[in-house]
Regions:
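Short, well-structured hydrophobic secondary-structure segments
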Residues: 29-33, 40-92
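Acidic surface patches and DE-rich sequence motifs
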Residues: 14, 25, 34, 71, ...
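Residue-level detector of beta-strand structural context in well-folded domains
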Residues: 20, 74-76, 115, 125
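Gly/Ser-rich, low-complexity
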Residues: 89-91, 98-100, 106-108
């Protein structure tokens, strides 16, 4: 976490949290969601326009990724100065990039080591790593296949609906907050 963010948190400790304004899709892209977008539907609803506007400003994306974390309830957030902005996840908290030699990095540009490979009933591959759990980027499925063969990584089957509970993350912190 950036020092300037830590300083802002200390200076203004009671800023309310923000929900539904930021989303992470299955390809590791960040989306900003205004009130109008949120009214269309949830981030993962599949409704046209519900994701919002994809962020393209590299420095903003880097700032989000440096200050991306998780709370005790498994809700992922971006610490924006003193305000915690909870992230709506289309699938998982991380999107993994994999090369043919088995090197793993997150969409947040952190390297990780493999714990286990999973595949759901749709054929979607996931990795449990030293950093956490996530979906493999669609562009890296072929590289994952090469790494599986090279390193003899075993694949464990899993049901997609069981992933959040099994790996301790919330896809929609806003929904969790609403149901309190």
């Amino acid at each position: 976490m950036d020092d300037i963010v830590k300083q802002a948190m200390a200076k203004w400790p009671n800023v309310p949290h923000c929900y539904s304004w930021l989303g992470l899709d299955t390809r590791g892209n960040w989306y900003m969601r205004d009130d109008r977008t949120q009214a269309i539907g949830s981030f993962a609803s599949g409704m046209p326009g519900a994701k919002g506007s994809m962020l393209k400003h590299e420095k903003l994306i880097d700032f989000i990724e440096r200050n991306y974390g998780v709370d005790a309830q498994g809700c992922w957030y971006f610490q924006n100065g003193p305000q915690r902005v909870y992230v709506e996840l289309e699938a998982t908290p991380f999107v993994w990039r994999v090369d043919a030699q088995g090197a793993i990095s997150s969409s947040t540009k952190q390297t990780a080591s493999l714990v286990q490979v999973y595949m759901d009933e749709r054929g979607w591959p996931y990795l449990h790593t030293s950093l956490g759990f996530g979906l493999v980027h669609t562009q890296d499925v072929a590289s994952l296949a090469e790494a599986l063969e090279l390193w003899h990584w075993p694949i464990q089957e899993v049901r997609a609906a069981e992933l959040p509970q099994r790996f301790g993350y919330q896809k929609s912190p806003a929904l969790m907050e609403k149901n309190k």
